[in-house]
Amino acid sequence: MIRGRAPRTRPSPPPPLLPLLSLSLLLLSPTVRGDCGPPPDIPNARPILGRHSKFAEQSKVAYSCNNGFKQVPDKSNIVVCLENGQWSSHETFCEKSCVAPERLSFASLKKEYLNMNFFPVGTIVEYECRPGFRKQPPLPGKATCLEDLVWSPVAQFCKKKSCPNPKDLDNGHINIPTGILFGSEINFSCNPGYRLVGVSSTFCSVTGNTVDWDDEFPVCTEIHCPEPPKINNGIMRGESDSYTYSQVVTYSCDKGFILVGNASIYCTVSKSDVGQWSSPPPRCIEKSKVPTKKPTINVPSTGTPSTPQKPTTESVPNPGDQPTPQKPSTVKVSATQHVPVTKTTVRHPIRTSTDKGEPNTGGDRYIYGHTCLITLTVLHVMLSLIGYLT
């Protein structure tokens, strides 16, 4: 029996090589990428480059506006380096603009203008009164950006509100130096003999939608002195339940005693607003215990006598008479003792005659004259010598 041979199967042909080769070449070949050159010029702006001169793909460069220009809202200030080596498209984003509107002491911008930073020519902004101010209807609260990029002036269309008129301060005074409008300050003080309890000043400030004084007004309370001290051997007049400023009490002593010190003292106020008496109370001392002062006599060494002495008169003998010599008396005088100086008046006999030359028969006539004053200095020396010799 002859067996039949199985037919041989041919292997399947390999896949086409060209498409695979093409794909391999695409995967293995490097990608061609281009660098961007300097960023483009954009009107009214300048790029922020740093140290870079070439920029790789996807690099970004930002711009800032030149002086006098502002970035237009919602416009980008950035360009991007694309894969083709070109910069992304751009448009002018810097335009002329006024600076931010002026801040006013009496008004502020309305809310819709607070976040704006671009104000081209012709832009109008509106203000509203600040707290503490109220609007004056005839005046507008607007400003316009002018051609020369400055804002038109804004009239003072708001005026200050007024605080309530302060009432009188009992036993005190309210000083109002600048009025009672918003922002003003008033000061408080008390009359002598009263103490200020509370604030010494307050301001007119905003309270809700109106204005009012910051603090509650103070009060002036009367200052009292402590009870005056009593004294021994004496009494006090003017006692009361309380003692206020300038009130007086008077002391007197019992019989047989003498008052030493101020008879009256009064209630006064210290720098710290504390009541105190003007001085300590007096004392009463027994008369027998009061020291007596012995009189003192001052004897000056020089000077003229205080009481003139009566002149001494003696007769001068007629010519030819011999005076009887007198024994000098000795006087002891200390150098510091005051010795009165006497005046000596000598009577000189003068014989008078008639016009016919007749002699005087009626005795001698005497006249006062030739008064001799011995100076104190000479007398002092003489007396000292006499005392020394004896």
From Swiss-Prot:
Name of the protein described by the UniProt record: Complement decay-accelerating factor, GPI-anchored
Positions annotated with a glycan in the UniProt record: N187, N262
Similarity comment: Belongs to the receptors of complement activation (RCA) family.
Protein's cellular compartments: Cell membrane
Keywords: Cell membrane, Complement pathway, Disulfide bond, Glycoprotein, GPI-anchor, Immunity, Innate immunity, Lipoprotein, Membrane, Repeat, Signal, Sushi
Residues of the Sushi domain: 35-96, 97-160, 161-222, 223-286
Free-text comment on this protein's domains from its UniProt entry: The first Sushi domain (SCR1) is not necessary for function. SCR2 and SCR4 provide the proper conformation for the active site on SCR3.
Main location: membrane
PANTHER family reported for this sequence: COMPLEMENT COMPONENT-RELATED SUSHI DOMAIN-CONTAINING, COMPLEMENT DECAY-ACCELERATING FACTOR
Tissue: Brain, secretory epithelia, skeletal muscle, liver, testes, thymus, spleen and lymph node.
Compositionally skewed regions (Polar residues) per UniProt: 298-319, 327-344
Example of a GO biological process term: complement activation, classical pathway
Entry GO CC: external side of plasma membrane
InterPro entries linked: Compl-Cell_Adhes-Reg (IPR050350), Sushi/SCR/CCP_sf (IPR035976), Sushi_SCR_CCP_dom (IPR000436)
Region (Disordered): 273-362
Topology of the protein relative to the lipid bilayer: Lipid-anchor; GPI-anchor
